[in-house]
């Protein structure tokens, strides 16, 4: 567990609020600035992982597929060095979506789904982001299941 004051639970409450604001603003520069250089972004639901410089392109592809995506935090758990948050996303499927071998053409449907992030911090920066979301709900709402 980190002993850096920037990783204290009190500091991380402010940090995660700014991080979530950057995601909702689709501000890639602000998001990336809050990541450690060797940060890992793992979307376990989609079976995708990116690290280092790949993370910008990966997050950019999320904003491209879902250009109006917005997240609301349902529950937030913060302790020294770690944030776990449950969220609901609402977005319009405006561009191609890839999930492994599945390629879904844009449907124009606006849908909502739930997810959970596990975010360890190091030196005040996001060290990794493990994302778990309800892909069955996404695929059903898009008419793909």
Indicate residue ranges for each PLM-predicted region.
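A short gly/proline-enriched turn/hairpin at secondary-structure junctions
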Residues: 3, 34, 39-50, 62-66
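A beta-strand edge to alpha-helix "cap/lid" segment located at domain peripheries
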Residues: 2-11, 27-30, 56, 60-145
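Short, aromatic-enriched amphipathic alpha-helices that serve as compact interaction elements
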Residues: 8-26, 34
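Structured beta->alpha junctions
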Residues: 20, 45-47, 75-77
């Amino acid at each position: 567990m980190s002993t850096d004051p920037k990783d204290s639970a009190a500091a991380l409450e402010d940090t995660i609020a700014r991080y979530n604001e950057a995601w909702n603003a689709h501000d890639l520069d602000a998001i990336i600035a809050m990541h450690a250089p060797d940060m890992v972004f793992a979307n376990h639901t989609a079976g995708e992982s990116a690290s280092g410089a790949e993370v910008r392109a990966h997050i950019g592809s999320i904003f491209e597929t879902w250009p109006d995506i917005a997240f609301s935090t349902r529950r937030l758990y913060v302790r020294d060095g770690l944030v776990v948050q449950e969220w609901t996303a609402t977005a319009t499927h405006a561009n191609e979506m890839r999930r492994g071998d599945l390629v879904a053409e844009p449907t124009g449907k606006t849908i909502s789904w739930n997810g959970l992030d596990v975010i360890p911090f190091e030196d005040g920066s996001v060290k990794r982001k493990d994302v778990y979301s309800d892909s069955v709900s996404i695929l059903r709402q898009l008419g793909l299941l």
